[in-house]
């Protein structure tokens, strides 16, 4: 058993309370490798932003759970080395799909876990979530639950269509499970293809897809039912067109990739939404940088020469999200 406190991590409880009160959101960036982690820590340390390091089940299998624990410990020390005296870093399991997986992460030093039982019938979702909460809270680990289903594909999480969270269920769900935060479905979705072309309109000037707006009416209803309760948005990458264009110009094929407009995420950040998940954007930044190097320098085979620019591009992206979208800069001095 490894306590996250020994590693220097924090849970989300105080972080979320401040974010809800302050009208900003905490960035939750998924990572799979060292370059992504370096970029996240550099951006967070420079902006003094609290940050959530997210690891999916697939990423945990890819990176190895033991290595992840030491990467998280290294991230805390690296942040201090960069001049961030009191780093506020969470290590969070994204989309845990079983009690066993969540328990294993708690035991390995994660400071926060998500149990995603949203695909189960309502009462089964409550029962499984409550079981995870009871175990995690013994070790002061915070728990995110999900109510409603997001469409799209992210690692091993897939759903054909979304089902909006039903506001009339949230009080009962939060009370009976004891969860610390709630991921809701209001129209975001996983992956770089968040909407089908038939769900969108097209910009007459550029021909690019314009996604439908998020269901802010559902969000506001949930806020009324659970005032001050931490709300989470998954699938909130914006799919920057410049990265899509670079990828496509350098041998890639991402037609009609479309994400959540940043102005809608800014609006969400000012509400009870205190955690916004971003994964696909960093994948796109990394892939765009790597493809460009390979296209410009086809003889290059030193990984540092293409992963270095990828890391720099991701750092730039993370800083932009922190400062210009979520407003979390300066909130962890």
Model-predicted regions and their roles:
Residues 3, 24-32, 59, 309:
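A short N-terminal beta->alpha junction/helix N-cap motif
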Residues 26-30, 91-92, 114, 231-233, ...:
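Short catalytic-loop micro-motif centered on adjacent basic/acidic residues
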Residues 233-239:
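Short catalytic/ligand-gating loop segments at beta-alpha or beta-beta junctions
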Residues 10-21, 34-59, 65-86, 95-230, ...:
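Alpha/beta enzyme core
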Residues 53, 60-64, 265, 274-292, ...:
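Shared catalytic-loop signature of beta/alpha-barrel
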Residues 1-27, 300-301:
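Generic N-terminal amphipathic, Lys/Arg-enriched alpha-helix
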Residues 289-333:
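Extended, intrinsically disordered, low-complexity segments
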């Amino acid at each position: 058993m490894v306590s996250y406190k020994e590693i220097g991590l924090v849970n989300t409880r105080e972080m979320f309370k401040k974010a809800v009160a302050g009208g900003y959101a905490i960035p939750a960036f998924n990572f799979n490798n060292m370059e992504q982690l370096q970029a996240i820590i550099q951006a967070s340390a420079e902006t003094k932003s609290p940050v959530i390091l997210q690891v999916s089940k697939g990423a945990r299998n890819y990176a190895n759970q033991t290595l992840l624990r030491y990467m998280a410990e290294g991230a805390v020390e690296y942040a201090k080395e960069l001049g961030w005296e009191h780093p506020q870093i969470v290590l969070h399991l994204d989309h845990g799909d079983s009690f066993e997986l969540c328990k294993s992460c708690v035991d390995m030093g994660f400071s926060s876990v998500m149990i995603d039982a949203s695909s189960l019938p309502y009462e089964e979702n409550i029962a499984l979530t409550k079981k995870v909460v009871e175990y995690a809270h013994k070790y002061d680990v915070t728990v995110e639950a999900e109510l409603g289903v997001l469409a799209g594909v992210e690692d091993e999480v897939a759903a054909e269509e979304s089902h909006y969270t039903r506001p009339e269920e949230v009080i009962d769900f939060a009370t009976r499970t004891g969860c610390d935060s709630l991921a809701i479905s209001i129209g975001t979705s996983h992956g770089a293809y968040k909407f089908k072309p038939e769900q969108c309109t097209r910009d007459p000037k550029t021909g690019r897809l314009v996604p439908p707006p998020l269901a802010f009416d559902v969000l506001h209803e949930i806020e009324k039912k659970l005032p001050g309760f931490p709300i989470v948005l998954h699938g909130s990458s914006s799919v920057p067109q410049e990265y899509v264009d670079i990828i496509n110009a350098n041998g890639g094929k991402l037609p009609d990739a479309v994400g959540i407009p940043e102005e809608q995420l800014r609006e969400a950040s000012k509400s009870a939404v205190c955690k916004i998940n971003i994964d696909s954007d960093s994948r796109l930044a990394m892939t765009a940088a790597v493809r460009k190097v390979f296209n410009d320098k086809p003889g290059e085979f030193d990984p540092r020469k293409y992963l270095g620019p990828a890391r720099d591009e991701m750092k730039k992206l993370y800083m932009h999200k922190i400062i210009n979208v979520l407003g979390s800069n300066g909130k962890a001095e």
